[in-house]
């Protein structure tokens, strides 16, 4: 069978079209993930701050404030996904790194205030359920972001997935803190555990501000 030059060129054109279509679909998947992330973390912020005020829990209020940073991070990623340029990817990656750093500031302020006041929040079983749901949802969202980030070769989306990982760890700390406070009256358990996470968060923030990849990080 004779393969003509026209046939070969046509095959290459079809391959290029398929690759372009795949990237469009992957970018749309990334946008959907970020819309979902914005919706979920906005709900986290409302519930966390609201329940925290009612229960007098600084940890819950801080966790809600963390969700605001998550929303900002997702908005940054939507900005990059709008065009997908490498320049935007680098800028977005640094902005996400700044969000990590801001997250560390929030946790430091929260934990220090809690330890200085020495006042335990009231037991809140709704808060415990809320934290447990976050522990389940955030790792699933982070894995989905990493999968799409690998397909798009986006460092910014990959960094954002690590921010979702950190949110999952914070929700686990929150869950343990609320549970220990409710069961054993250990008011100090939440701020001490939160401070233990600061080295990881600060390292990721510095890496992001330098424009370095976060793919080396392990949690």
Where are these regions (language model features)?
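Alpha-helical transmembrane cores and adjacent cytosolic helix/loop segments
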Residues: 2-219
